[in-house]
């Protein structure tokens, strides 16, 4: 009787639906399928737009339970690129990113809110210029699935804004230039 019960349980478990769990992904920066760009109003007349060329990170994601998502990103702030060498030197200096002292910025998620239809708010802590503050990213799950090379990918976009002074950047460029807008594109490859 015990053998029959054991066999029945094993057989049933083979045909039971598998529990879906979060998958771990590495952000695909090598294939240039991810970007961190920024925009700052320039004295109320136009915008300075740039990007960070060197960053890495990972995330876990389960479409059935997006609130369990975890995100970790590290940015090499020395890699800032606004397409103007002299300006980039200034941005790396003590007035802005102070990369001689703080060559890395990090973001670590603390919670995720599911707003429906793939819209998420990813709450976390941003450490920039030696200061750590809470930051919310308005994100959207673009899609996920098999890629042509046998891997599995998931992609997201995100936007956030923060005040420079909150991260110890004290230079006064006027009220229209006090905030940084970040645009994020993230494609992860399942580990």
Curated annotation (Swiss-Prot):
It comes from the Bacteria. Residues 1-22 form the signal peptide. The keyword Signal applies. Belongs to the UPF0312 family. Type 1 subfamily. GO terms for cellular component: extracellular space; periplasmic space. Keywords: Periplasm, Signal. InterPro entries: Lipid/polyisoprenoid-bd_YceI (IPR007372), TTHA0802/YceI-like_sf (IPR036761), UPF0312/YceI (IPR023480). Its main location: periplasm. It comes from Shewanella oneidensis (strain ATCC 700550 / JCM 31522 / CIP 106686 / LMG 19005 / NCIMB 14063 / MR-1). This is UPF0312 protein SO_3370. It is found in: Periplasm.
